[in-house]
Amino acid sequence: MRRTVFNEDHEAFRETLRAFIEAEVVPVYDEWFAAGQAPRDFYHKLGELGIFGINVPEEFGGAGLDTHKFEAVLYEETARAGVQFGGSGVHVLLALPYIKMLATDEQKKRYLPKFVTGEEMWALAMTEPGTGSDLAGMKTTAKLSEDGTHYVLNGAKTFITGGVHADRVIVAARTSAPTAEDRRFGISLFAVDTKSEGYSIGRKLDKLGLKTSDTAELAFVDVKVPAEDLLGEENKGFYYLGHNLASERWGIAFGAYAQAKAAVRFAKSYVQERTVFGKPVASFQNTKFELAACQAEVDAAEAVADRALEALDAGELTPAEAASAKLFCTEVAHRVIDRCLQLHGGYGFMNEYPIARLYADNRVNRIYGGTSEIMKTIIAKDMGL
């Protein structure tokens, strides 16, 4: 089937991005992998390339585009090369939508120019120890001072992608107690400066995959957050978080599809080169059947991911549709990558092969942004069940 989601501008960006990855990332990726994070100055290079400013208004230094298609190209190209851009994904996919939706003009003038250049990297802190998917159960608090000039932030967050390098973190905290009718009431969002006194980074977490993405625990002890860094209105944070989940889940879905596509590419190349019993692994009927089945699943996932992308750009992607896309694409990726690793035999278990890293990187897709079980719950509710 002919693919129609991308135009000449997107393909030109793809060529530029592919050349950048080959020159700036592939030669040093093993060093990043061993270090457990990309170096901080790499994000300045992404800023210079224009990655961070695609969807930022021109008045703040961006390109002023209103599309996720360039992000989609980035997902495909990083997966194709078997690399990750550190924790930069959360900067654009997670943090930027909240800034664009909630920040005042004054806040945008302060935040966005440095966002675009990579001078200030952003992260998002929702998850807490012991809460997981139950965001309404968060314990972190932010109390307004008597003079109304600042909030006092106390609490802890965990699994924060980009938490080591972040210069600002959007922190979800309780500003009021939940009501009897709605336990989701009372949560607010703050753009917290990580240089603030009382803000500390705990452990840099050692993950199964996504090794170049810094992930950390955060702690807040009487952190003074200026009132002008409140994003949106008090007590409406849960609504804001829910509003942007569709775009986040699309990003995970599209990234998972791209990983599955890359896995087939890696496996095809390997079985054509690898010889056993005197002939290429690709010549065996089982190999052909396995890769054919994987390709069919990738084709289906591509159609779902592309359709969700078009709906997202049109402002029409519903929560249930986003959940469906995430569930389908991540489950396809799980099956396809596992089968492609199997075709590598013992070499597929070695981290020097991209399929092994891809296997580990992919596993979290069925967990973060809402587990597969949560996605099924959302879909079932939409069905009236």
Predicted regions and their residues:
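Glycine-rich phosphate/pyrophosphate-binding beta-alpha loops
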Residues: 131-132, 158-163, 210, 247-251, ...
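A short, Trp-centered hydrophobic/proline-enriched beta-strand micro-motif
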Residues: 118-126, 172
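Helix-loop "lid/cap" segments that line or gate small-molecule binding pockets
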Residues: 93-102
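Short Gly/Pro-enriched turn/cap motifs at secondary-structure boundaries
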Residues: 88, 130-133, 159-162, 180-181, ...
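A short core secondary-structure module
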Residues: 149-201
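Alpha-helical interface subdomain recognition
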Residues: 1-81, 85, 102-107, 114-119, ...
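Flexible, small-/acidic-enriched active-site or ligand-binding loops
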Residues: 137-139, 195-226
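Long, acidic (Asp/Glu-rich), low-complexity accessory segments flanking structured domains
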Residues: 218-240
